Amino acid sequence: MDFKYDVIVIGAGHAGCEAAAAAANLGSKTCLITMDMNKVAQMSCNPAVGGIAKGQIVREIDALGGYMGLVTDQTAIQFRILNRSKGPAMWSPRAQCDRNKFIWAWREILENIPNLHIWQDTVKEIIVENGEVVGLKTFWDVTCLLYTSDAADER
């Protein structure tokens, strides 16, 4: 396996999953590093997506081609409109999701994106040369390097 990437994303929370998917979908050779493949995009003890603030962010992610809204639709167990006692400007959709199905739906999406490698490990060191990040080392002594502008012809 080639351990040189255009983009390396550390952490497979919601933002890390969206970032890795976006980079890979734009054609970048991408590596997503997570400590636990069974906790990709894990939701908190309140597995809600939506509400006034997060609902706006989810709509923006959706407009940019992201996956959080799609995964929410696939794994929701309850949909509700919040703040109905207030005016329409304050109404906000929210979904409660099945936490385990949410993880598996995200994994299925990520594992089927071309250019995206998912690596289970812990990052122990960021490699910096001349003030620039050039890669990282993991707990299992795997080295992942970033392509540099000088090495663009190597691909």
Regions of interest found by a model, annotated:
Residues 3-13:
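Beta1/beta-strand and adjacent pyrophosphate-binding region of the FAD-binding site
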Residues 11, 96, 150-151:
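Residue-level detector of intrinsically disordered, flexible termini
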Residues 16:
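N-terminal Rossmann-fold NAD(P) dinucleotide-binding loop
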